Amino acid sequence: MLVDTGLGLISELQAKLGWAVLLQIVPITIVAYNLLWFIYASFFSSLRKIPGPFLARISRVWEMKKTATGNIHEIMMDLHRRHGAIVRIGPRRYDFDTMEALKIIYRIGNALPKADYYKPFGLPSFPNLFDEQNPARHSAIKKQVASLYTMTALLSYEEGVDGQTAILKEQLQRFCDQKQVIDLPRFLQYYAFDVIGVITVGKSMGMMESNSDTNGACSALDGMWHYASMMAYIPNMHAWWLRLSSLLPIEVPIKGLTEYVERRIIQYRLKAAEFGDDAALKGENNFLAKLLLMEKKGTVTPVETQQAVGLNIGAGSDTTANALSTILYYLYTNPRTLHTLREELERYVKDGPISFQQSQSMPYLQAVIKEALRLHPGVGTQLTRVVPKGGLVIEGQFFPEGTEVGVNGWALYHNKAIFGNDASIFRPERWLEANENINIGGSFAFGAGSRSCIGKNISILEMSKAIPQIVRNFDIEINHGDMTWKNECWWFVKPEYKAMIKPRRCCLSRDESLV
C-alpha cells in the first residue's frame, strides 16, 4: 500500500512539474529538512546534551556507514567507554549499556514496540514472529507456535540431536585422522543446519557429511543478513526494493533456502494426502508435521507455516553456530578452563551422549556457555524499541514518545561497572559467584522481555550436546596457519578462524595439560 501510494505521488508530481524540476526539488528538500532538524537537535531539543558523533545528530548516515565496516559492535563499545551510559547514534536514536536501561526498555508488561528498523527482516505483507512490530500482534503469533518450544517438546527432539552430534564427532575424527586444517566456524554452521533441519522438517540437510553448503543455505543467510543490516537504516525502502527485484533479474539472497523449505512442505503435504488422514503427520516428531496438523485445525495458515519453518531454520542455525564457535575458541585458548570443564564432565558421565537434563546439572559447563555468550553475544547491533505515549525516564533522562532506544549487548556485557575490571577476560567462575544484576543480564544474549528468542532452548540443547562430545574427545589447535580470530558483524557477529583437530592428550598430568 505504501509503495503504491509513493509511486502514485511521484507520478502526480512528475505530471505537474516535469522531471527536470522534480529532480531539483527533491535534493533541496532533503538538505533543508536535515538542516532544520540539526538546528532543532542542537539548540532546542531536551536531548541536545546527550553525547555522540556529530553526524548522528542530523542523519542515519553515520550509523549506516559504521555498520558497513562490519565492526559496529566494537564501535558501540568504544562510544560507551568514551561517553558513558547514554550515547546518541542517530536522529532520535539513543543507545544504553546499563542494567537499568535493559529492565525498562525490554520490560514484559506494557512492552515497547519494535522500531521500523526490523522491517527488512521480513516481508511487508506477512510480518513474522521476529519482525512484527506491534506487541499485541506479536503475542498472537507467538501463542500459535508456543507449544512447539515447550520443555516437553524440546526433550522430544533430543534423539534427533544426538544422531547429528554423533555425525559431528565422526566428521571431526576424519579431519583429525587426515590432519586437515578446517574452517571450524563454517563446519559448526553445517552442524547447526543439520540439527535444525532434523528438528524443523524431519531431515538433515546433509551438510556435515558432504562438508559443503548444500542448497546454498549458508551463503543465502549471509546475503540476507548483509541486506537487512543495511536496509534497516532506510526501512521504508524495503518494500520498494522487493517490488523492483520482482521486476528485474536481481538475485534474491534467500532464494535457495526458501526453495528448500517449500520442497519439504510440499513433500509432507503429498505424504499426508497419500495416507488420506493425519496418521502420517502424527507419526513424525518435527515442527513441520506439527504445524501441518495445526493447519488442519485452523490455528495457523499455510503462509504462517512457511514463515515459522523458514524462521526456525534461518535464525536457529546462525545463532547456534556462532555460539559454538565462540565457546570452542575461548575454551581451547584457555587451557585451565578447558581442564576444569573436562574434570566436571568426567565426574558426571564417563562415556556416551550426555542428556540435556544431565547437562543442566553441570554448573561449570553452563558457566562456560554463559561466559562465552557474554564476551561474544550473537547480535552486534542495538535491539531497538520505540518509546510509547507519555515518554520514558531512562538513566535519569526523559525521552519523549517516538524516540528510538535500545541496549547494545556488546557494550552491556563489556561494561566494567557491571562485570568488574576483568570484564574483557574469559572467566566462567563469575557466573558461579554471580550477583543479581549479572544473572538478569546473563539472558540478554538471546534478547530480553516478551521479544526474547523463542528458540533459545533449542540452541542451548545443541550447545549442551556438542560441547561435551568435542571436549571429551579432541584437542583443537586454534588459529592454525596465518588466519587469526576475526569477528564480522552483519546483525549477527560471526567468528572466523581456522583450526586443526587433534586427538585428545588423555595421559598428561594436570600441570602438563595447563601449558
Curated annotation (Swiss-Prot):
Keyword terms: Heme, Iron, Metal-binding, Monooxygenase, Oxidoreductase
Matching PROSITE patterns: CYTOCHROME_P450
Keyword Heme among record annotations: yes
Cofactor(s) the protein requires to work: heme
UniProt EC number: 1.14.-.-
Regions crossing the membrane: none
GO MF annotation, one: heme binding
Positions contributing to heme binding: 453
Similarity comment: Belongs to the cytochrome P450 family.
Job description of the protein: Can detoxify the phytoalexin pisatin from garden pea. Pisatin is an antimicrobial compound produced by pea in response to infection by plant pathogens.
Name by which UniProt lists this protein: Pisatin demethylase
Species for this entry: Fusarium vanettenii (Neocosmospora pisi)
